[in-house]
């Protein structure tokens, strides 16, 4: 049943997701494409985690953070993609009330965790380039673990604000969501209760995560740029900058899509455009991160080559 009587309200027990399209042919095409992307996402990020674990050359803070970033990528993609794939194959795309809350909070958890991990990686690059003599002390195992744990705690707090706000909403029968997953904005539009407080809570939580991590990344790279420009050796400049290009690319992709979805005025783009950008943010970007780091990072390419050479000659 979609609705259950609850006092003077009709409580919603499930939501109908309109998805990306109702064209049956296009649904099959999108199912195939997104399934392939998801398989590459999971296999690519798992490979990154395993490679960092087995390669002693990659037992450095940067790759410790990268392995957790890969875990967050799998979590972010898995919070939405499996349900979306199932919905491509059924005529009526639904998600239970509880499932909607879990999906919403999972996306908030891994999205925020990824923000803080990217900020931690920027701080790591700042210490490596601007304070190389203090790097081993300032980025000790204890500090790295604290940054990782802090990232997950921040993600959990962000997810809690989303989940508590969701369970505080009242729904009076309307249960059709014009999206492919349970996002807070369309859910707030469906609610028959006063959502102003919860919108402020969500905006504050998501805004704090974004602003704080962007600030850390911007300050870190400002100092990095100043330090690189002061280097007299061209080779030194190139080497220092090459260690940052992969991370900068990942940051640009991630925050570019986040800015489009959550910062730009809703009137500046259509709902269909928002869906496309959301797919890019939650499905495509998690696939691109391992490719970016493996293709642009010489240490990872070297570790991959040594690993395959051992496999070939063993």
Swiss-Prot record:
Which PROSITE patterns does the UniProt entry name for this protein?
A: G_PROTEIN_RECEP_F1_1 (PS00237), G_PROTEIN_RECEP_F1_2 (PS50262)
Parts of the chain on the Extracellular side: 1-28, 79-102, 158-199, 262-274
Q: Any ranges marked Cytoplasmic in the topology annotation, and which?
A: 50-57, 124-136, 221-240, 296-314
Q: List the disulfide bonds.
A: 100-192
- State a single Gene Ontology molecular function: olfactory receptor activity
Please indicate which superkingdom the organism of origin belongs to: Eukaryota
Question: Which topology term describes how it sits in the membrane?
Answer: Multi-pass membrane protein
Example of a GO cellular component annotation carried by this entry: plasma membrane
Its localization reads: Cell membrane
Q: Which UniProt keywords apply?
A: Cell membrane, Disulfide bond, G-protein coupled receptor, Glycoprotein, Membrane, Olfaction, Receptor, Sensory transduction, Transducer, Transmembrane, Transmembrane helix
One Pfam match, given by its short name, reads: 7tm_4
In this protein, the residues bearing a glycan are: 8
Q: Where are the transmembrane segments?
A: 29-49, 58-78, 103-123, 137-157, 200-220, 241-261, 275-295
BP GO annotations: G protein-coupled receptor signaling pathway; sensory perception of smell
List, alphabetically, the InterPro entries matched: GPCR_Rhodpsn, GPCR_Rhodpsn_7TM, Olfact_rcpt
Please give the PANTHER family that the UniProt record associates with this protein.
OLFACTORY RECEPTOR
Assigned protein family: Belongs to the G-protein coupled receptor 1 family.
Described by its record, this protein's role is as follows: Potential odorant receptor.
Q: What is this protein called?
A: Olfactory receptor 5P66
* Top-level taxonomy: Eukaryota, Metazoa, Chordata, Craniata, Vertebrata
């Amino acid at each position: 049943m979609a609705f259950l009587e609850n006092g003077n309200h009709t409580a919603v027990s499930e939501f109908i997701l309109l998805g990306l399209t109702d064209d049956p042919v296009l649904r099959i095409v999108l199912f195939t494409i997104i399934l392939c992307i998801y398989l590459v996402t999971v296999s690519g990020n798992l490979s990154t985690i395993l490679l960092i674990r087995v390669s002693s050359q990659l037992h450095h803070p940067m790759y410790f953070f990268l392995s957790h970033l890969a875990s967050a990528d799998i979590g972010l993609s898995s919070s939405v993609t499996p349900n979306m794939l199932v919905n491509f194959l059924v005529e009526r795309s639904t998600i239970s009330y509880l499932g909607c809350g879990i999906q919403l909070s999972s996306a908030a958890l891994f999205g925020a965790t990824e923000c803080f991990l990217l900020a931690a990686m920027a701080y790591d690059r700042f210490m490596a380039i601007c304070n190389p003599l203090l790097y081993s002390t300032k980025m000790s195992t204890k500090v790295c673990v604290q940054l990782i744990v802090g990232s997950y705690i921040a993600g959990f707090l962000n997810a809690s604000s989303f989940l508590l706000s969701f369970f505080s909403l009242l729904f009076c029968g309307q249960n059709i969501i014009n999206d492919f997953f349970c996002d807070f904005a369309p859910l707030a539009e469906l609610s028959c209760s006063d959502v102003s407080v919860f919108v402020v809570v969500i905006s504050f939580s998501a805004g704090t995560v974004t602003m704080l991590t962007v600030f850390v990344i911007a300050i870190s790279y400002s100092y990095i740029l100043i330090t690189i420009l002061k280097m007299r050796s061209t080779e030194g400049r190139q080497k220092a900058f090459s260690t940052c290009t992969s991370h900068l690319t990942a940051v640009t992709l991630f925050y570019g899509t986040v800015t489009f979805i959550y910062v730009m005025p809703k009137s500046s783009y259509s709902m269909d455009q928002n869906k496309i950008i959301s797919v890019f943010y939650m499905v495509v970007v998690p696939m691109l991160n391992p490719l970016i780091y493996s293709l642009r990072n010489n240490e990872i390419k070297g570790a991959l080559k040594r690993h395959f050479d051992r496999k070939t000659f063993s």
